[in-house]
């Protein structure tokens, strides 16, 4: 097995351990979680981990609402970042700042880190401006996301 693939497999396995919201996760996802908590402090980041057709695992079909559309755009943004040589968005850390609900990506990030930071920053801002519909949490993906 390719060492890079083995590293990814190990990271995914480690990130899936645990049974609570304190489970380990790749560092970038930890940073994204913190960005979400910066812009939407009234909700748990976990509320966004299994929402609609695009927030969380997978992503297909038509977004169910504006919040789900934020996740679709975020997925597409990560796909674009992956085109940067050696850029793995789910594992790339970056420098940013949260101050009173405002997110800023720091200037010292390399091209990949800057792209991923901006993807996460824009998604967190989008989440803050989109209504949350409890009926779109943990939906039946096969029935609603074709």
From Swiss-Prot:
Entry cofactors: Ca(2+)
Upper lineage: Eukaryota, Metazoa, Chordata, Craniata, Vertebrata
Described function: PLA2 catalyzes the calcium-dependent hydrolysis of the 2-acyl groups in 3-sn-phosphoglycerides.
Protein's name according to its UniProt entry: Acidic phospholipase A2 2
Cell compartments where the protein resides: Secreted
Family affiliation: Belongs to the phospholipase A2 family. Group I subfamily. D49 sub-subfamily.
Origin species: Naja kaouthia
Catalytic activity: a 1,2-diacyl-sn-glycero-3-phosphocholine + H2O = a 1-acyl-sn-glycero-3-phosphocholine + a fatty acid + H(+)
GO molecular-function terms, A-Z: calcium ion binding; calcium-dependent phospholipase A2 activity; phospholipid binding
Entry annotated with the keyword Cell division: no
SS bond list: 38-98, 53-145, 55-71, 70-126, 77-119, 87-112, 105-117
Residues annotated as catalytic: 74, 120
CDD domains on file: PLA2c
Pfam families noted in UniProt: Phospholip_A2_1 (PF00068)
Principal EC category: hydrolase
């Amino acid at each position: 097995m390719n060492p890079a693939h083995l590293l990814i497999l190990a990271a995914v396995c480690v990130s899936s351990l645990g049974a609570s919201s304190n489970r380990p996760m790749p560092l970038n996802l930890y940073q994204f979680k913190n960005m979400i908590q910066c812009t939407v402090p009234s909700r748990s980041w976990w509320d966004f981990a299994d929402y609609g057709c695009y927030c969380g695992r997978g992503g297909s079909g038509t977004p169910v609402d504006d919040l789900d559309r934020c996740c679709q755009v975020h997925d597409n943004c990560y796909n674009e970042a992956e085109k940067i040589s050696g850029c793995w968005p789910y594992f790339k850390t970056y420098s940013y700042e949260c101050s009173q609900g405002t997110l800023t990506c720091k200037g010292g990030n390399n091209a990949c880190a800057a792209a991923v930071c901006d993807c996460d920053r824009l998604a967190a801002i989008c989440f803050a401006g989109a209504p949350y519909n409890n009926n779109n949490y943990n939906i039946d993906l096969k029935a609603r996301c074709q």
